[in-house]
Design a protein with these regions (language model features):
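Extracellular ligand-binding/catalytic regions of CAZymes and related secreted enzymes
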Residues: 1-118
Length: 118
């Protein structure tokens, strides 16, 4: 479990407030690796407006598999890398327990990997 603790000012957990997912149909590169996903959000969470023609009762289903926050990594073809947390809440969990937590460790490891060859 990553980020299952209080965050600074945005409620609980590293996934919330605004979320995003990996989706090949929407431009996620084929080489992207989904490291983890947060699911089970309340019905207050909906698809991005560009994915909906209209909002109706059917569009408010809570069990929609596309309403999730994906933690994604991919290497770019030019030698770089992308680490996407899939949620604006991620940053608010970095300082929890004096930075001794899963969010800080994973962020540190991702940044260290990106800087390794530079």
């Amino acid at each position: 479990m990553i980020g299952d603790f209080h965050s600074l000012g945005l409620g609980r957990g590293a996934a919330g407030d605004e979320i995003d997912r990996a989706d090949l149909r929407l431009g996620t590169p084929h080489q992207a690796i989904i490291l983890g996903s947060a699911i089970g959000f309340s019905t207050e969470y909906r698809h991005a407006i560009e994915e909906q023609c209209q909002i109706n009762r059917d569009s408010l289903e809570q069990d929609d598999a596309n309403i999730r926050a994906d933690l994604v990594w991919f290497d770019t073809f030019s030698g770089g890398a992308v680490f996407s947390t899939g949620s604006i809440n991620w940053i608010s969990c970095l300082n929890y327990n004096d930075c001794e937590n899963t969010v800080s460790t994973l962020t540190y490891n991702a940044l260290s990997r990106m800087l390794k060859d530079n």
